[in-house]
């Protein structure tokens, strides 16, 4: 049976600058529970401890968000996203105290070693720990397997590949998921973003390659161009004969019901979303990049290229300002030197 992890109340928070209310969390968690969703993930878009001036502040704290969801769930498990460095061990302790069932410990795809103490902390409490490798497009299959094996060694009961930038095509997904499935003794999962319009297709390919966990959001509600759309995914999974706890009819009832209390808009794929996917940048960076390009008067798409050269990962918003400022200075020098590009002068 395929496990569906619903990130609407976590990744969806990115789409509204992390402003979900307690009432919305309670209503959606209850509806998702009734729809037979396996795991309902809740929190700031960047996970436990993510609320900040840099990343965006939530109107309510982690405790109230999790307590609200916990009270609404009966059969669905409560999950959280945790990035070491943004969150602390105390944040996991709080989540476990409240009754979180699944802790997804997420690291950059080449930094799994920082997940050890948090996976161990979760397992010691008798709860489920998943490892998550973010920005998975930035590492080849063998490197991802080596990192996933570390998480497995630390006690992770599954490893999820996160296509955080919406960069991947089906062939890339197949190669990476197959490598992990063949090399691990634990389940493999996949989390897609829709920057190139491939989220559902990539999720189906991941399942064909042996993944047993897929992430999705109602109406695709999520960062950038959105996540895998839950209703579309479940319909396609039924067509392909995948067994789940839910059905298309149940998730359609869930989606329609959200119009009264959540009203998530299915994201449209904008040129900026395509650019962030093409250049492999975290989907949540789009509004920050657009703002910086406007403030410094530089070309938005040139800024995407520059940031891609820096190989940005989540949590490096300050570098967006740095590169926009550098582009502006280069433009000013170019004008002063009669059109000679700064990079030509330094070559």
Swiss-Prot record:
Please tell me whether the keyword Lyase is annotated for this protein: yes
Residues the record lists as binding substrate: 10-11, 164, 191
Upper lineage is: Bacteria, Pseudomonadati, Pseudomonadota, Betaproteobacteria, Burkholderiales
Q: Does the keyword Zinc apply?
A: no
Q: What class of enzyme is it?
A: lyase
Q: Which SUPFAM superfamilies match?
A: Aldolase (SSF51569), post-HMGL domain-like (SSF89000)
Record-annotated Pyruvate carboxyltransferase domain positions: 2-252
Q: Which family does it belong to?
A: Belongs to the 4-hydroxy-2-oxovalerate aldolase family.
Tell me which UniProt keywords the record has, alphabetically.
Aromatic hydrocarbons catabolism, Lyase, Manganese, Metal-binding
Query: GO terms for molecular function, please?
Result: 2-isopropylmalate synthase activity; 4-hydroxy-2-oxovalerate aldolase activity; manganese ion binding
Gene3D superfamilies assigned: 1.10.8.60, Aldolase class I
Which PROSITE patterns does the entry link to? PYR_CT
- Origin species: Burkholderia pseudomallei (strain 1710b)
What are the recorded Gene Ontology BP terms?
catabolic process; L-leucine biosynthetic process
Do you know which InterPro entries this protein is assigned to? 2-IPM_HCS-like (IPR050073), 4OH_2_O-val_aldolase (IPR017629), Aldolase_TIM (IPR013785), DmpG_comm (IPR012425), DRE_TIM_HOA (IPR035685), PYR_CT (IPR000891)
Q: What is this protein called?
A: 4-hydroxy-2-oxovalerate aldolase
Which residues are named in the active-site annotation?
14 (proton acceptor)
Query: Where are the residues marked Transition state stabilizer as a site?
Result: 10
Query: Catalytic activity annotated for this protein?
Result: (S)-4-hydroxy-2-oxopentanoate = acetaldehyde + pyruvate
Query: Quick one: which residues bind Mn(2+)?
Result: 11, 191, 193
């Amino acid at each position: 049976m395929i496990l569906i992890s619903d990130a609407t109340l976590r990744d969806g928070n990115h789409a509204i600058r992390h402003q979900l209310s307690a009432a919305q969390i309670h209503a959606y968690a209850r509806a998702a529970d009734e729809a037979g969703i396996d795991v309902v993930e809740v929190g700031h878009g960047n996970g436990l401890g993510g609320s900040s001036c840099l990343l965006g502040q939530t109107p309510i704290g982690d405790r109230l968000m999790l307590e609200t969801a916990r009270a609404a769930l009966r059969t669905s498990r409560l999950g959280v996203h945790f990035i070491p460095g943004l969150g602390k061990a105390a944040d996991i302790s709080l989540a476990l105290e409240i009754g979180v069932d699944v802790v997804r410990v997420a690291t950059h795809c080449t930094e799994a070693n920082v997940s050890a103490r948090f996976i161990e902390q979760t397992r010691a409490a008798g709860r489920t720990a998943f490892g998550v490798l973010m920005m998975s497009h930035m590492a080849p299959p063998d490197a991802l397997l080596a990192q996933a094996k570390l998480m497995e060694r630390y006690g992770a009961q599954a490893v999820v590949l996160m296509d955080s930038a919406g960069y991947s095509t089906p062939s890339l997904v197949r190669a990476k998921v197959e490598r992990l499935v063949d090399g691990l003794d634990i389940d493999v999962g996949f989390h897609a973003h829709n920057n190139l319009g491939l989220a559902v297709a990539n999720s189906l390919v991941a399942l064909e390659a042996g993944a047993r966990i897929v992430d999705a959001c109602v109406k695709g509600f999520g960062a950038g161009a959105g996540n895998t759309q839950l209703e579309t995914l479940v319909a396609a999974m039924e067509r392909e004969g995948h067994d789940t706890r839910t059905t298309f009819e149940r998730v359609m009832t869930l989606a329609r019901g959200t119009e009264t209390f959540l009203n998530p808009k299915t994201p449209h794929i904008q040129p900026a979303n395509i650019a962030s996917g093409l250049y492999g940048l975290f989907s949540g960076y789009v509004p920050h990049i657009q703002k910086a390009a406007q403030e410094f008067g530089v070309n938005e798409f040139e800024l995407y290229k520059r940031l891609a050269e820096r190989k940005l990962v989540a949590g490096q918003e300050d570098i967006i300002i740095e590169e926009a400022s550098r582009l502006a200075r280069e433009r000013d020098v170019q004008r002063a030197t009669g059109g000679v590009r700064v990079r030509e002068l330094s070559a």
